Amino acid sequence: MFDSVTVIGAGRAGSAIAARLRERGVRVGEEGELYLLCVPDRAIPDLAHGIPSGPWVAHVSGATPLTALAPHVRRFSVHPLQTLTMSRGAEQLDGAWAAVTGESPDALAHATALADILGLRPFVLADDRRALYHAGAAMASNFLVTLLRGAARLLADAGAPPEALVPLMERTIANDFELTGPIARGDTATVERHLAAIRSEEPALEPLYTALAEATRP
């Protein structure tokens, strides 16, 4: 549906997306049929205002509403539900889901077409549900880093290698997140020993452990 795309932004998302478009034979350059904003959320409105009317305009933000693309009416968004890095290329997009948002059937068709070109698995997301959706994505991805850092501190304090946590976390994912451990068993005595040890060695982590334990109880 798009033979040419102007990708604005050369960060993690923009670089991976531009590479994939080129792989699929789409011309990436100036005056494209689509202007795709791959920039920080706060920069989207000003950049959108500077784009001439006529072509489609879209962004790849997870939380930003389509009104940020005003005054354009031919607009949509495609948010790859994936964590992206500069050290890898277009293969990061393979098989990832993508939230597509549009205000008309035509806009959704164009958004879905772009997702397909990028190798993504699109699903339709209402514009007014974006913040809630993105909060869930942040919990699953960003807070996983927080959990690993906290767990690594506890292992290091105990004299155990923090890198030993990685296979454990990978297996949890491979096992479809089946809950195991003391909370799953209802072993409150072990949980209390955990809390006592954390309180002694890493008191700043006690509120985090307590909140997670409460949220994890079956």
Regions found by a protein language model. Give the residues of each.
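Hydrophobic beta-strand scaffold residues
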Residues: 25-28, 75, 122
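Internal alpha-helical scaffold of NAD(P)-dependent oxidoreductase catalytic cores
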Residues: 90-174
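NAD(P)-dependent Rossmann-like dehydrogenase/reductase catalytic/cofactor-binding core
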Residues: 163-218
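Rossmann-like NAD(P)(H) cofactor-binding subdomain of soluble oxidoreductases
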Residues: 15, 19, 32-90
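NAD(P)+-binding Rossmann beta1-loop-alpha1 motif at the extreme N-terminus of oxidoreductases
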Residues: 1-31
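Phosphate-coordination loops involved in phosphoryl transfer and adenosine-cofactor binding
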Residues: 2-4, 54, 95
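Hydrophobic Val/Ile/Leu positions in short beta-strands of Rossmann-like dinucleotide-binding domains
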Residues: 5-7, 37, 100
